[in-house]
Amino acid sequence: VVVIDHHSPGDLITKEEKDGEIVGGTVAVDEYVDTHVNPYLVGGDSQLTAGALATEVAHIINPEIKDLIKHLPAIAALGDHAECGEVYQYLELAAEKGFTKEHLAKIAECVDFEAYFLRFMNGRGIMDTILAVDNIDKHEKMIDALYKEYLKRVDTQLKAAIPNIEKTHFENGIYFNMIDVEKYAHKFTFPAPGKTCGFVHDSVVQALGEDKPIITLGHGPDFGVIRATDA
């Protein structure tokens, strides 16, 4: 079993340090897997995404595909809203292949959109085209078509959700927004409840500004999704 992930795997059970920096560590789950690739094991954090890590592993396994896949980490970074030095380096690598940041962001959103409908079906051919690793001649048209539908679905969901946000501005300056996505969002369609909360949060941030302390809670009968700014 091989695990490639960028989420926190829990506290380090053991760690190896060099010059005051963590260069290796283990966590509880390592007992149950053969290989665990995770930035937290070497003192990193979630800004170095699983998509970037998986691409690097693929390149190590098969160096011949380096140029074919070198734009994928940038897509993963933009899809996860990652920000770190490596992200800018990956964006530069993607630019060498002619991919702008705007187009890479569209690809990330189209991947998210198509993945929702594919779920557990085999969509390798479609995803290869979306990611521009195969059927390159069809890539632009597919992105244009999917992105238009993506924007349409998001707009429809936000029109239902935004009027039903419960807003509170606390004395300490925090803007707290809460919405019952089970009640006030369209069900069984894209975007799903978790994503809907993210889009609602982004709309509030766009209105108030990223420098404001904003917390958004989307909830249902048995779940909750929280988004927040860094302010």
Report each predicted region and the residues it spans.
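Interdomain hinge/lid region at the active-site interface
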Residues: 118, 124-150
